[in-house]
Amino acid sequence: SPTIIGAQAANELLDINEVKASFVLTIYNGRIYISARSIDEVNVQIIMERLGGGGHMNASGAQFNHTDMEEAVACLKEVIDKMIEEGDI
């Protein structure tokens, strides 16, 4: 399924030099799924929890219903920017 491919892609992106976290969004059956992965000190779980999802420090996810990809990406960016600004990540 596209969600499995998204999770695999998120894992592969961590192999890029100096990448500490990756977020891959996929559309499947009318929903948008985020696969979040990280290494080292980046806690993607708290980011995904702010979006209604969850998981573990280095592997987490969330889902969006009734939204499009552009809006989902904007929402993810907004949460990350706010958490950086607040010193949460």
Name every feature range the model reports, one short phrase each.
Residues S1-I89:
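Gly/His-enriched, cation/cofactor- and phosphate-binding structural elements
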